[in-house]
Amino acid sequence: MAKVISIHSFRGGTGKSNTTANVAAVLAAGGARVAIVDTDIQSPGIHVLFGMDDRPEPTLNDYLWGKVGIRDAAHDVTDRIRRIATVADGGALHLVPSSIRPGDIARVLRDGYDVAALNDGLRTLARELELDYLFIDTHPGMNEETLLSITISDILIVILRPDRQDFQGTAVTIDVARRLDVPERSEEHTSELQSRGLISYAVFC
């Protein structure tokens, strides 16, 4: 069963998406089956790190609005890793991007979306792609979508900048995660990620 890893920050500009992309790429290069879902629907951008078009299609938005299945919105970006590193047998990386179209972003801001459908889609994606790891690149701050991501996660990584506002906001995030009973298996997962040289700065709960 896939381990669900949410990478979150209280504010934007912390390097959250870059961290998500790099950790996922290292795991895939090591032979794991990995996927990233960009749930930062209001300000998407992780697709740029993988050299995708400015307007990748289909997207997570298309799935949430019932236009395509979640598997159809998952783009295989393994070849992007192969350009800079050797990928072990079996390794693969898929990305489900969010739409960068202004109209789609405006629709999300205006109408929102069904968070239950997102939850179902994540589970379906993990099953159909036979994933080892599923990364959720969250929207900064605290909202309904972020709380869902935290709730279904096996691991929560919170990235922050060394300033007072981030420290305070991150403390709130960690407290909420504990109240939502994020599985208390962080030591096991931390050791696993450390053994792969993947943890540099993170807060686990």
Show which residues each predicted segment covers:
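A short local structural element in Rossmann-fold oxidoreductases
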Residues: I46-H47, A106, L147
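Short, well-ordered alpha-helices that flank and scaffold nucleotide-derived cofactor binding pockets
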Residues: A25-A29, V48, T151, D175
